Regions:
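A short, exposed loop/beta-hairpin motif centered on an aromatic-Gly-Thr core
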Residues: 15-24
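A structural detector for beta-sheet-dominated domains
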Residues: 8, 24, 58-59
Length: 75
């Protein structure tokens, strides 16, 4: 089964957004994020959010791997 990663403090546009990704591991979660959001600033936001523990993990999720949902921040 996969895990659901809820990543906060990403996809900034004046204020932070968030992404919800279903993946088997945090490394795979990052790969999926990079496939969808490939701007350097978005990659840096993801890495910083992980470094600062700005994410939650729900284990044992019966959902296909990939982006579940996301929202950009906004002013």
């Amino acid at each position: 089964m996969n895990k659901l990663y809820i990543i906060e403090e990403v996809l900034y546009d004046y204020t932070p957004g968030m992404a919800v990704i279903c993946a088997s591991s945090l490394d795979r979660c990052r790969e999926i994020f990079l496939e969808e959001f490939d701007w350097d600033c978005e990659i840096e936001e993801f890495d910083e959010s992980i470094k600062q523990s700005m994410f939650k993990v729900i284990e044992g999720v019966n959902h296909a791997e990939g982006i579940v949902s996301y929202v950009y921040g906004g002013g």
